[in-house]
Amino acid sequence: MNYLVPAWHRLLDDWSWTIPRIEFDDAVSHIKTFQENQVPYSLVITDYQPQLSTKLNQLTISPSQILNVFDYLQGVNHLDNQIVTYRDFNWPADSQFDFTSFRIVVLVKGQLYARITFDTQGKILWVDYFVNDKHTRRLLLDSRGFISREELFNDQDQPTQHIYYDEQGYWRIKHDLSTDQVEVNSMFADLTKHLHYDYLSDLLTEVIQDHLLNHFDHDNDHLVVTLDDQTKIEPDKYLQYQPLFSLSRWHPYQQNLAKINDKSHNNLALLADNDETYELIKKQTGLDVPIIPLFQSRFNLGHSQRLSQERIGLFIENMTDDEAHQAVELIYQRLVKKPAAEALTILTYSIEKMQLAQNCINQLKENHQGEFILASEAPDEVEEILTEQTSIPKLDIDAQRITTPAEIGRQFDSLRIVIDWGPTVDEFLQITAISTGIPQLCRQTNRQVKDYQNGVICPTISDINQGLDYFLGNLKHWNQSLVYDVQLMNQYSAAELMTKWQTLFKK
């Protein structure tokens, strides 16, 4: 069996203020590769995750087995979801309920009594309670339909204690956040070796070693641990299982890498997600480690060749403000000369860079006032006539923020070429371009883009024009890029990535 230990620390957020964003995780990427190849795997969950079943559904993850530290401590052994509504709580007889779009506010005699917060699927995440307008406690609900944890707060609205419950409402463990000490309910003394622990990590480690991985077969099983500096469990506790530590740019790992490197006695198995991580590992440990990309290719060719207008995608997430403005200005100079032939979509991940994209467009309008109009700002009939009479070009320039993998697929479907001029290559963007079959213009050399084959390396922003000229309006070069990308798709397919995993798993 393949056991994976992900670094999943965060709980689900209050969606009333959470801005949708795309997230990447090395464990999820490994899991997708296993699932694509129908290779069984188990998850070892070390963090408190009351909404785990919801998370797995959102990620379309179906492990063969889930070994969960807090499920063991709380006596839960199933994944059956159960809906809990606000009516299931015991409210004072004179409670009034104020329903809003995102939560329910409970009032008693005109005073705030409680506030119920929901997730994106309408399930209750938690209930906050108040006394004299002061936040006193929070009840977190498990997606399987029970109160899982109670959080107590001081007068400064800081959490002081976590109390964990089972499905029957009995408390199992109490965690003092100021001292990190843990008390185990004597009613469940057979669950653990001790009733008191100085550190929560000691209890969690005991559960993993004595109850979750106690049947680990060193000859046939494999343990893949995401190395992460935020984990509550010291990574050296896994060394007895001869693990493969997965390191990626998505999780800080330098501190724990130093710890396990000192304790492993030169018998450390590490895995990097890209060349950059490989170089950092080699610099810190001196080890040459294998690389398995996190993102697999998918044969999903775009349809830009069916469009008369060639759309340029400019990805600015990793560019500075000045670089983004320069690149947009450069592409504008192309569009204004042939507005019917080319278009521009500025792409970002974050809300901050989306604002930069809008600023770039506004700067164009300010610097070139009267020289063009945006196609998105549809003029009325009179303005349309005046535009045609004065030959003011209508330019197709827009900005799009990518928040899901599906969204990037929709955006790339109509792109003719993509520019990623950040200091480092964005691997997800890159593998999507390869899967879509479109060329890429990059700032740095990398193993996926071969100069003047499926892209052009552009050391300076002014070089971008040369790369655009090479592929746009030239079907021969574009088709050559497509053929090269199809070959790369085979190299980065789920089957090929699984072959790399099988090589690592051979003992």
Language-model features and meaning:
Residues H477-Q491:
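A short, well-ordered alpha-helix in the C-terminal region of glycosyltransferases
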Residues H211-D217, Y238-Q242, L247-L270:
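Membrane-proximal helix-turn-helix segments that form the acceptor-binding/catalytic region
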Residues M1-H218:
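Long terminal accessory regions outside catalytic cores
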Residues L294-E381:
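Conserved catalytic-core segment of nucleotide-activated headgroup transferases in glycan assembly
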Residues S414, V418-N479:
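Catalytic binding pocket for nucleotide-activated donors in carbohydrate/polymer assembly enzymes
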Residues I385-L429:
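Donor nucleotide-activated moiety binding/catalytic core segment of transferases
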Residues K263-V289:
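A short, active-site helix/loop in glycosyltransferases that binds the activated sugar's phosphate group
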